[in-house]
Amino acid sequence: MAFLTLSLLSCKSKEAETSGLSEKYFGEKTDETGAISYDSLLVAMQGVDSVEAKVTGLVSSVCQTKGCWMDITSEQNKEAETMFVEFKDYGFFMPKDLAGKKVVMVGKAFREVTSVEELKHFAEDEGLTPAEIEKITEPKEELKFLASGVMILD
């Protein structure tokens, strides 16, 4: 809980703003060697608490406030759950125009319950309307990823 509280404060308080795709590497430098697909990660997460992995995936959305988180989705299965990604020690942020691009990231996948307060904060960061945000009334168990490094592939 302390980690997520810190993340809420960090997202709102950092002055650095990230936009544009001029950089390819963020955080720990990584490449595609040994990476598994997001769909393979979903299979690997069945029945376990966490997995250290290098994963490729499609970015579906990015924090529009600072770039302090992104969502990853399956390229093949549009019904698959989305994975919420944050960045180790808030040492880097993603470009705010990264949605629709493919990335490879290294770090740890895990499941965690996200509070209503945090869900509303992230919905606000994403630019959802007040009416959409008000519909958030229950905590949600989510697949999350703490990335130590990200590389933009396209």
What are the language-model segments listed below?
Residues 1-9:
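Sec-dependent bacterial lipoprotein signal peptides
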Residues 11-154:
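OB-fold and OB-like single-stranded nucleic-acid-recognition modules
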